[in-house]
A protein has these predicted regions:
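FAD-site-proximal beta/loop scaffold in flavoenzymes
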Residues: 135-151, 237-314, 382, 407
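Short hydrophobic core segments
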Residues: 8-10, 98, 113-123, 157-158, ...
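Glycine-rich dinucleotide-binding loop and its adjacent helix/turn
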Residues: 47, 122-177, 181, 210, ...
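Flexible, glycine-rich terminal cap/loop adjacent to redox cofactors
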Residues: 10-36, 41, 45-48, 52-53, ...
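N-terminal Rossmann-like dinucleotide/flavin-binding domain of flavoprotein oxidoreductases
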Residues: 2-3, 22, 42-112, 191-217, ...
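A Rossmann-like FAD-binding core segment of flavoenzymes
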Residues: 92-95, 99-106, 113, 174-275, ...
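Beta1/beta-strand and adjacent pyrophosphate-binding region of the FAD-binding site
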Residues: 2-15, 151-161
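Rossmann-like dinucleotide-binding cores of NAD(P)H-dependent redox enzymes
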Residues: 72-79, 146-147, 152-156, 162-224, ...
Length: 456
């Protein structure tokens, strides 16, 4: 194998694959360094297995059948992302752990390599809180839970973010007794309180015991039973067969040699990058979870492509922005989100349109009226046919929330005024009409509803 490359990508997850392919399409010599199987968290321990389990649980499959489907689906997706597939695309692959040496040098095992440019894409890892007794409890994380042959009879899920909520609901639907423990005052702390409350109610309806303001204080084994007792900060106790941690993630950078290369971290411990995704070290870029930006596969893909494009460009560069990047929590109902919340929009003179799903005919006919759509826009303008204000954000909570949010994301990306959305004919009765109806509220009364000023 050659030792001198145009670009070396360290990390073979979503961001790394996107970076390698982007550079290769530009005709550059690319080496991908990956410690383990190509594909990363999304394929093996994240999006693919979790969404498969969620779907299997919703379809009423048995626990064993559901976990079997997870393994089969992961294998199917992974087959399209192997090292051999990458080599067929002209990308060289070297298995091992890459370590920066400075001045474009990279050490992989006994091999010393050199590159004009380097992209770091090593992802993130689960965070384990310092709780007495937790280390000896054989706890699970997203990296280990999908290896189970079947779900245990009872499960304590610690952490009420997207991963915790999704897996708690899926496990409950598979017949497991689930307690979801969250230290804060609401589930989904990055979402609006109303969205979090809708999800909490849905989880309780599925049998999940939701405990809020209840930080985990201690884990102890029950005498001879193999079960665990969890003592919580609110004074209550939970007993369960297994504990699943969903308590956040940290940058995966052990042994990466950041100091040797002059790569600095921010206050939260993520690799510091600028708008180009360049690090503090000359010739080194970073993409994906490692940067501490949006921790989503689609964001990692976009960052990987942007970092590689900027790293290999002869002139000019493209900025990476998270402003119009949507994300989805795949509970039932789904929570789709892009841009500002109402509280954030209040600081910018924003206005809010609100549509309960009970007022959307498609939701009524489907019998799925739980949730709402909230569309956020800037100050109202009426000039040269531009009605309403520019779209600044949206929260969509409904069974199709993960699909509807993308119309708002496109409107944000295009700088569209809400009047354009309202004047675009939407098929009736469709879920997408929710966007049209909400957009109309931002410059006229629709169905007895009119937009109001955003409040903090």
């Amino acid at each position: 194998m050659r030792t001198d490359w145009d670009l070396i990508v360290i990390g073979g997850g979503t961001a790394g694959l996107a970076a390698a392919r982007q550079a290769r399409r530009g005709g550059h010599g690319v080496l991908l360094v990956q410690d383990g199987e190509v594909g990363g968290d999304c394929t093996f321990t994240g999006c693919i297995p979790s969404k498969t389990l969620i779907a299997a649980a919703a379809q009423g499959l048995s626990s064993a059948h559901a976990f079997g489907r997870v393994r089969a689906t992961v294998a199917q997706v992974a087959a399209a992302e192997t090292a051999d597939v990458l080599r067929s695309e002209g990308i060289a692959v070297l298995e091992g752990r890459g370590r920066l040496l400075g001045r474009g040098g990279v050490q992989v095992g006994g091999a010393r390599l050199q590159a004009a440019r380097i992209v770091l894409a090593t992802g993130s890892r689960p965070v384990t809180p310092a709780v007495p007794g937790l280390a000896g409890s054989a706890y699970l994380t997203n990296e280990t839970v999908f290896a189970l042959a079947a779900a245990p009879s009872s499960h304590a899920v610690v952490g009420g973010g997207p991963v915790g909520c999704e897996l708690a609901q899926a496990l409950a639907r598979l017949g497991t007794t689930v307690t979801l423990v969250e230290a804060g005052p609401q589930l989904l702390p990055k979402e609006e309180p109303e969205a979090a409350e809708v999800v909490a109610t849905a989880l309780r309806d599925d049998g999940v015991d939701v405990r809020l303001r209840a930080p985990l204080r201690e884990v102890t084994p029950l005498d001879g039973s193999g079960r665990l007792r969890l003592r919580l900060g609110d004074g209550s106790v939970v007993e369960a067969d297994r504990v699943l941690l969903a308590t956040g993630r940290a940058a995966a950078m052990d042994g990466l040699g950041l100091d040797a290369a002059g790569v600095t971290l921010d206050e939260a411990g993520w690799v510091r990058t600028d708008r180009r995704l360049a690090t503090s070290a000359r010739g080194v870029w970073a993409a994906g979870d490692l940067t501490g930006r949006l921790p989503f596969t689609h964001a990692a893909d976009a960052m990987g492509r942007t970092a590689a494009r900027n790293a290999t460009a002869r002139v000019g560069w493209l900025p990476y922005s998270t402003r119009a990047v949507p994300w989805v929590t795949f509970t039932t109902p789904e929570v789709g989100r892009v841009g500002l919340t109402e509280e954030q929009a209040a600081r910018h003179g924003g206005r809010v349109a609100y549509l309960p799903m009970a007022e959307l005919d498609r939701a009524v006919t489907a019998g799925e009226t739980r949730g709402y759509l909230k569309l956020i826009a800037g100050p109202r303008l009426v000039t040269r046919g531009a009605l309403g204000g520019r779209v600044l954000g949206a929260t969509v909570v409904c069974s199709r929330g993960g699909e509807l949010v993308h119309e708002a994301a496109l409107a944000m990306r295009a700088g569209m005024f809400t009047g354009r959305l309202a004047q675009t004919t939407h098929a009736y009765p469709s879920w997408s009409m929710a966007v049209q109806l909400a957009a109309g509220q931002l410059f006229q009364e629709v169905g007895g509803r009119r937009a109001r000023p955003a409040v903090a």
